[in-house]
Amino acid sequence: MTIKLHHLRPAPGAKTEKTRVGRGEGSKGKTAGRGTKGTKARKNVPAAFEGGQMPLHMRLPKLKGFTNPFRTEYQVVNVGDIARLFPEGGQVTVEDLVAKGAVRKNQLVKVLGDGDLTVAVQVTVDKFTGSAKEKIAAAGGTATEL
């Protein structure tokens, strides 16, 4: 007779049922394998418990200060970027900057003063730094805030 898959059985003693402890004196009752007294005999200890030593989360310093929930964030464009994106000069609005891929739409835009500007541009955005206004004016352009 050939042996088939359904003839196979686990070896005797290989599979034993789980022992249910604490269910009567005759079968691992009373202390249920925990020994007598002590912390481990009673409920359980928290995962972060370090045996009475000052725990790590209390040893580390707290973060100082706070984050202002009303802070306004601007997308920044430098004067040098405007000179590179608009070499012929002319009108520059937030929509033009979005079309050129310099900023994302529906966001506030601020022009910073890094770089040089040689052509006259009429820039209309949400905010300017002082140096950006000076460089735009020096090149013969205008800086208008929305």
Swiss-Prot record:
The cysteines joined by S-S bonds are none
For this protein, the record's SUPFAM superfamilies field holds:
Ribosomal proteins L15p and L18e (SSF52080)
According to the UniProt entry, which residue ranges have a biased composition of type Basic and acidic residues? 15-28
Q: Which Gene3D superfamilies match?
A: 3.100.10.10
Q: What is the lineage of its organism?
A: Bacteria, Bacillati, Actinomycetota, Actinomycetes, Mycobacteriales
Instruction: From the Swiss-Prot or TrEMBL record, give the protein name.
Output: Large ribosomal subunit protein uL15
One annotated Gene Ontology cellular component of this protein: cytosolic large ribosomal subunit
The family database entries (PROSITE patterns) matched by this protein are listed as: RIBOSOMAL_L15
- Highest taxon of the lineage: Bacteria
Q: How does it assemble?
A: Part of the 50S ribosomal subunit.
PANTHER family cross-referenced by the UniProt entry? 50S RIBOSOMAL PROTEIN L15 (PTHR12934), LARGE RIBOSOMAL SUBUNIT PROTEIN UL15M (PTHR12934:SF11)
Instruction: Give GO MF terms, alphabetically.
Output: rRNA binding; structural constituent of ribosome
Keywords associated with the record: Ribonucleoprotein, Ribosomal protein, RNA-binding, rRNA-binding
Q: What does this protein do?
A: Binds to the 23S rRNA.
Q: What family classification does the UniProt entry report for this protein?
A: Belongs to the universal ribosomal protein uL15 family.
A GO BP annotation: translation
Which Pfam family is an annotated match for this chain, by its short name? Ribosomal_L27A
Using the UniProt annotation, give all residue ranges assigned to the region (Disordered).
Answer: 1-46
